[in-house]
Amino acid sequence: MGRDIGWADTVRFRLPPGWAVDVEEHEGQPVGTFRPPPPAAGVLRLVTDRVVPRPDGGSPVADTLQEIALRFVRPQDPRAGDRTVDSRPDGAVIAQAMMRTDEDGRAETHYLWLVGAVRAGAAAVAMFSFALPALMDGDESCAETLGRIDDAIRTAEIL
């Protein structure tokens, strides 16, 4: 069945069963980390943010949210692909992309999601990244894991 995870008073989602939950710190910001049960590979990371448009900017919060989603899919980055930005029936925005990286000799594939909505005059966003070794990308167990994560993220509730 999984377990409900709430993060930073911004997002709630259902983590698949058996996943380990931890917190890392990156540049002074807490990062939720979630690891699938063995033998599955990879790590899901989560950060959140709330962006209030500048009062003198004149653009509505919904425009700010759309701009964040479009920047999230990295249109200028040649490493990114499979970019989409969609709206859910509840008004939330979902942006998705995939990126291949090579850091310190480690080839990795990163699946990226942003779920955001207008909440209390701000653009509230949850940004998820699932990283796995590139050689595991396409493996049947990884495809199953990705399917579960995708379902959980697409149905995440922005608070």
Roles of regions detected by a PLM:
Residues 2-71, 104-106:
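Secretory pathway targeting signatures of secreted, lumenal, and periplasmic proteins
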Residues 11-14, 120, 144, 148:
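Structural motif
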Residues 18-20, 91-93, 156:
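Short glycine-aromatic motifs
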Residues 44-47, 110-114, 128:
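Short amphipathic beta-strand/extended segments with alternating polar/hydrophobic composition
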Residues 66-120:
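Signature of long, low-cysteine stretches enriched in small and polar/charged residues
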Residues 120-127:
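Short hydrophobic/glycine-rich mini-motifs in sensory/regulatory modules
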Residues 127-159:
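Surface-exposed amphipathic alpha-helical segments
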